[in-house]
Every structure is written in C-alpha cells, then in structure tokens.
C-alpha cells in the first residue's frame, strides 16, 4: 500500500500526529567528477574561481537545501533540523579528471526521518559545484547519489561504504627502494594491492606524501596525501579516517608480500562493526597487525586522541581499544618483507 495515496487513490501527506518523537539521523553521499582543467584552480581541498570558493559555497547551499526540503519535495513534512554536517573531499582519479566526494549528515529529534533532507542537501551541494565550475568546462558528471545511513524510525539503514587504503612508506634503506615499487607478483606491489582491494572496495587510494608517486608506475592511481607532518603509517591511517569519516576502511601495507584474496575475504567476513578494528593477530606476540586491518568509523576518535598525546604507533593505539583479532591460516601470511634476505625467500 502506498501511504501517500488515500482510499480514493488521491495523493496526500501522511499524518504523523500519532507518532512519537525520537532521535533520527540520515547520511547521503554523491560524487562530482570534474575535468582536468579544474586542477589549475585547485588549492588543497578548495577550488578558487571568480565566483568564489567552490567547496565553501557548496556547503552553504547544501545546508540551505536541507532546511528547505519540505518546500521542494511535495509530501515531506516541515521539521526541525538539529544538526547538519558536510564532509567534502577532492581526490585525483587518474590523470584526466578528479572527483569530489560529498557526504551530508542530518540529525533531528522528531516524528519522521531526515533521509530526504540528507539527499536534498548533498544533491544541491553537487549542483552548486556544477554551477560554479561550468564556466571552465561542461564536462562535469554528478553520480552515485544514494542514502548510506538512516537510524531511528521503523527501520534502520546501514550501508556503510567500504574503502581501501594501500599504506605505503618512503624508501626502505635495507631494500634500496620504496616497498610499493618492489615487484613480487609481476608488477609493483602498490599496484597489486590496489587491484586486490578494488575487488571489494568502492574506492581505493594510495597513501602518499606530496608528489611522492610522480614519475613512477603508480602516478596515475588515486592518492590521499598525508595531512600535516608525516609520522609513519599513523599519518596515512589518520588521513584516511579524517578524509572519509563515515566509511569502513580496509587498510593493507606494502610490507605484506603474501597478501591475497583469501586473506582479505576472511578479514571482511569476520569484521566487527561495533569495534574500532578487526586485524590479524601476530602469531608470536599476539598483538594486532595494525597494517592489515578492517577499520570502522569508530577508529577516528581513537587515532585523533592518540595524535593529541603524541602516540604514533598504530599497534599501541589499537591496544588501547577493543579489537577483533583473527588468526592467519599460515604463519607467513602476514610476514613483513624488510630485507633482501626476506625478498630472496619469496623468489
């Protein structure tokens, strides 16, 4: 039965007067694909055009749209908006275009949900980006608009996206080159892990320092550039958590030469959404292998707290929280390759 039709099949607004108010939340997302011409106007995470700062304007427009949803969608109820937050991140996708990932989260305490408000907000923010950038190029695509979370009401929706991070580092002194560029499987290992994660994740990124992969076989892969001073793997993990706080992260380091589909599938199958992370367990000492793990949005608060107190070791950070530890099928599965001798054992 369609609730927006009465007994005479005439449209109506649903009567919610008998419903009980409660906390409700919805998160929607979409992607705006922009041509490479826009890169000339990009500074950090903002696009500066004659019309003004694009991202800031999009956030303002999207917030206004959230509050005006009932004026735009005929049968939406007017309701109080208690919170509205946008997360917008610009990432490079290959050489010929870039993408803007938008998320809009809306909160209320009322009798009906706010999923339409979240969808309206993220859509208008995307349209605002289109409007401001169309003078540079009309080759702009708005895509993948969807609701990814709804809580409160009759039914919860939890479609937390899974993103992947290939955790790289600098040049290894003992190996003589960056581990992401070492060939274990007939291609640079960073490319191998990227392709592996792409089978399971909506988006995959390489961690990077500024310009780290220019002039290498990895230069066309999407990257997340470390925010602030680089302090090892912690920087890449925290940057990912900060860039997309509402998603799950499958994080694999290039140190792991034996990583394969079976290991990844086991990690995903046993992941706990109610915990900070699910990781493989170190066979010798029982600590979480932080560089081969499934991280939930709960990890952001933990890693931010660790950064604030000067703790930069991912293993020690995870030991501060409840984690799901799973045993590898083979002891060498999560072995780190740190020397030419280790590399020789593979080949």
UniProtKB/Swiss-Prot annotation:
Record field: catalytic activity: Mo-molybdopterin + GTP + H(+) = Mo-molybdopterin guanine dinucleotide + diphosphate; (8S)-3',8-cyclo-7,8-dihydroguanosine 5'-triphosphate = cyclic pyranopterin phosphate + diphosphate
GO cellular component, one term: cytoplasm
Keyword Lipid metabolism carried by entry: no
Positions contributing to GTP binding: 167-169, 179, 226, 255
Annotated stretches, region: Molybdenum cofactor biosynthesis protein C: 1-158
Keywords of the record: Cytoplasm, GTP-binding, Lyase, Magnesium, Metal-binding, Molybdenum cofactor biosynthesis, Nucleotide-binding, Transferase
Positions bound to Mg(2+): 255
Annotated EC: 4.6.1.17, 2.7.7.77
GO BP terms in the entry: Mo-molybdopterin cofactor biosynthetic process
Similarity comment: In the N-terminal section; belongs to the MoaC family. In the C-terminal section; belongs to the MobA family.
PANTHER family: MOLYBDENUM COFACTOR GUANYLYLTRANSFERASE
Entry comment, domain topic: The N-terminal domain of the MobA region determines nucleotide recognition and specific binding, while its C-terminal domain determines the specific binding to the target protein.
Function field: Catalyzes the conversion of (8S)-3',8-cyclo-7,8-dihydroguanosine 5'-triphosphate to cyclic pyranopterin monophosphate (cPMP). Transfers a GMP moiety from GTP to Mo-molybdopterin (Mo-MPT) cofactor (Moco or molybdenum cofactor) to form Mo-molybdopterin guanine dinucleotide (Mo-MGD) cofactor.
Name of the protein described by the UniProt record: Molybdenum cofactor biosynthesis bifunctional protein
Species assigned in the record: Synechocystis sp. (strain ATCC 27184 / PCC 6803 / Kazusa)
